[in-house]
């Protein structure tokens, strides 16, 4: 499309958000693009468990425009994400801890969190809004077994959803 969109996990503190957003805007402008809109994603925090609620990030959605070539825009968004992540890694731990770019793309939007698959649509009202349509939806509901659960480590990842056990084709055929 002619725009890209992304979901961001941000710290709750507005001063920390301002630092992150200034880095993000700087990188967007370096690519000759424009941050068209910044939206607070509506959520229903009342359904969260204690651990998820205590670590819940502020979730924002961005819309980026300025390039009519979808493939080129996708590449620019990838570069922006990588540079922003690198700059944030070089900041203080307080900013790094609660920051994560969930998705930034012309092709997909990822909604995720420390939620069960049944909680997902109740937590994100966007997912039950009739104005939002999708040709494909992927839901991954397995919890991590070898890492401490966090919002950023929730499945799916940007390009992959799996249970941590990527086996060989031959091995999978043997089990069929």
Identify the role of each PLM range.
Residues 1-176:
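N-terminal segments that mediate ammonia production and transfer
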């Amino acid at each position: 499309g002619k725009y890209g969109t992304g979901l961001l996990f941000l710290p709750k503190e507005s001063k920390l958000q301002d630092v992150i957003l200034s880095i993000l805007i700087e990188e967007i402008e370096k690519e000759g693009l424009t941050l068209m809109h910044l939206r607070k994603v509506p959520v229903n925090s009342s359904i969260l468990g204690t651990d998820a609620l205590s670590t819940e990030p502020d979730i924002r959605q961005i819309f980026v425009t300025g390039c009519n070539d979808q493939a080129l825009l996708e590449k620019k968004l990838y570069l922006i994400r990588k540079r922003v992540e690198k700059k944030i890694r070089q900041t203080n731990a307080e900013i790094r801890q609660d920051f994560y770019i969930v998705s930034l793309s012309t092709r997909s939007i990822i909604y995720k969190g420390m939620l069960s698959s049944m909680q997902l649509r109740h937590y994100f009202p966007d997912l039950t809004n009739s104005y939002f349509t999708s040709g494909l939806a992927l839901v991954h509901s397995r919890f991590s077994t070898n890492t401490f659960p966090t919002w950023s480590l929730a499945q799916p990842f940007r390009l992959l959803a799996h249970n941590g056990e990527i086996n060989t084709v031959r091995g999978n055929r043997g089990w069929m």
